[in-house]
């Protein structure tokens, strides 16, 4: 048995066997269909806009306010804290208060400022500046206060 008969027996299809019996030649067809490349279409994409920083005008106005206060009693501490929660800087003059109440207000405001992520600084005798996180304090004021003032307020 020749190799061509074995190949014919195992690999040819019944249609090919029948065509071989009648003397027809096998058609050579290319399995790959030739396709035209797809037409190029002009597609326009919107240009990427650079990211713009948008700041609300109301926020800019609130951050530029500084509130000056002279509380006389400890009960006014909550109103001062409300200004800080409203993102406004507050300067507090505690000279018209007793020392005990002034210390209590500073303690209360220190906790408030810590809770909102702000800052509190002494800017003069019995005068403090409290700021929320959106206000930066730059610089420092040296303490050149009189000795008698220092002895009256032991805690500051």
From Swiss-Prot:
Alphabetical keyword list: Cell cycle, Cell division, Cytoplasm, Septation
InterPro entries per record: Cell_div_SepF, Cell_div_SepF/SepF-rel, SepF-like_sf
Cellular localization per UniProt: Cytoplasm
Entry annotated with the keyword Cytoplasm: yes
Span list, region Disordered: 20-50
One BP term from GO: FtsZ-dependent cytokinesis
Pfam families cross-referenced by the UniProt entry: SepF (PF04472)
Family statement drawn from the similarity comment of this UniProt entry: Belongs to the SepF family.
Function statement: Cell division protein that is part of the divisome complex and is recruited early to the Z-ring. Probably stimulates Z-ring formation, perhaps through the cross-linking of FtsZ protofilaments. Its function overlaps with FtsA.
Stated name of the protein: Cell division protein SepF
Species this chain originates from: Bacillus cereus (strain ATCC 14579 / DSM 31 / CCUG 7414 / JCM 2152 / NBRC 15305 / NCIMB 9373 / NCTC 2599 / NRRL B-3711)
Lineage, opening ranks: Bacteria, Bacillati, Bacillota, Bacilli, Bacillales
């Amino acid at each position: 048995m020749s190799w061509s008969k074995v190949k014919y027996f195992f690999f040819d299809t019944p249609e090919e066997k029948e065509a071989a019996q009648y003397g027809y030649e096998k058609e050579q067809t290319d399995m790959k269909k030739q396709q035209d490349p797809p037409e190029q279409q002009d597609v326009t994409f919107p240009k990427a806009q650079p990211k713009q920083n948008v700041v609300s005008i109301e926020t800019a106005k609130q951050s530029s306010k500084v509130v000056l206060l002279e509380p006389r009693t400890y009960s006014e501490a909550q109103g001062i804290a409300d200004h800080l929660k409203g993102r406004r800087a507050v300067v507090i003059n505690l000279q018209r208060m007793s020392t005990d109440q002034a210390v209590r207000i500073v303690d209360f405001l220190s906790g408030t400022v810590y809770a909102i992520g702000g800052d509190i600084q002494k800017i003069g005798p019995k005068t403090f500046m409290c700021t929320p996180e959106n206000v930066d304090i730059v610089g420092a004021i040296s303490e050149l206060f009189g000795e008698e003032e220092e002895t009256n307020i032991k805690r500051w």
